[in-house]
Amino acid sequence: MKMYDLPDKRGHFGPYGGTFVAETLISALDELCKQYEYYRGDAEFQTEFFRELKHYVGRPSPIYHARRWSDHLGGAQILLKREDLNHTGAHKINNTVGQALLARRMGKSRIIAETGAGQHGVASATVAARYGMECVVYMGSEDVKRQATNVYRMKLLGATVIPVDSGSRTLKDALNEAMRDWVTNVGNTYYIIGTVAGPHPYPMMVRDFQAVIGNEARQQMQEEYGRQPDALIACVGGGSNAIGLFYPYIGEENVRMIGVEAAGKGIDTQKHAATLVTGRPGVLHGNRTYLIQDENGQIIETHSISAGLDYPGVGPEHAWLKDCGRAEYVAITDGEALAAFHALCRFEGIMPALESSHALAYAAKLAPTLRKDQLLLVNLSGRGDKDMATVAQQSGISL
């Protein structure tokens, strides 16, 4: 692949991305673009960002060889990039630290966020507490029920959690409400989008803050294995953990990049969230990307056992990587993800998030088809504490 320098100045990844928002937000986004372009090249900002990642988040996150599970499956060796070990338990904190530091430099006193699984909400509430800022988190009321523990964590951290009862009452609807808040309070408010979606510059900005995952992985693989992995595997909802791992590898065409979406009850049903596998291009939440929509262009309600993958869109960079053939996208069902969740618990003593379990499930399918000396690097994007009630319920156990 020739030198990769996307997005362009207007935020496009080929035909995807861009800025499709109300006129009232254009000046706020222009200002954000200007400020981010300045600070991404500012040595002092970058030094503070990486210092926070080291001393507050606990980076670098290690790469762990899941030896027992690999032996059990046969075939390729499965390696895990342990984002679950970060402060707050997932990759989301990488991005919220970066955006909160930017918000402070822009003179904002209030941050807002949307959240699905609650991890981005917790990470946003965490940095708000760290930097002494007001925090409001929008969350679909369906997700509030599914993720009661994370809701309480956000409140403990001082955030106000606002349940959203419109639409499917999930991440899509929370994002809509957060956008409305931002339009109204743009003077003192910074909107921390949690994934690589939304209007420009968010897909680029979130990618840049999450690229620490892939940059660390490249160095760690070279030091520990003397080479890079044969394939990268990461779950994809909006796609920030995946793009964080993939981005530094885009130019290495001998490394496969595999994004794993939620097939829910099956992609032949209406109960899934496999946007890139089944969707087609359209505009949602400020950018052009693949969407799950009906023949009239109306968004179809999605389903996944994991709240963080339950989204009808996807980051525009993933849409571009799919179209140009650099990345592959597959889908894993609720049942397959649950089986992988239990397997990692039993074989490695590691409890993965249900989102990450989708990536693990595909690794478990792929590994036996490959040689023993081949390496699969899976992004273990988060830990599974938040999913205890869901997993127990699936096993017929009431907590």
Swiss-Prot record:
The modification N6-(pyridoxal phosphate)lysine is found at K92. It comes from the Bacteria. GO terms for cellular component: cytoplasm. GO terms for molecular function: tryptophan synthase activity. It is an enzyme of class 4 (lyase). SUPFAM superfamilies: Tryptophan synthase beta subunit-like PLP-dependent enzymes. Its cofactor is pyridoxal 5'-phosphate. Keywords: Amino-acid biosynthesis, Aromatic amino acid biosynthesis, Lyase, Pyridoxal phosphate, Tryptophan biosynthesis. Pathway: Amino-acid biosynthesis; L-tryptophan biosynthesis; L-tryptophan from chorismate: step 5/5. It catalyses: (1S,2R)-1-C-(indol-3-yl)glycerol 3-phosphate + L-serine = D-glyceraldehyde 3-phosphate + L-tryptophan + H2O. Signal peptide: none annotated. Its EC number is 4.2.1.20. Belongs to the TrpB family. The beta subunit is responsible for the synthesis of L-tryptophan from indole and L-serine. Tetramer of two alpha and two beta chains. This is Tryptophan synthase beta chain. It comes from Nitrosomonas eutropha (strain DSM 101675 / C91 / Nm57). The gene is trpB.
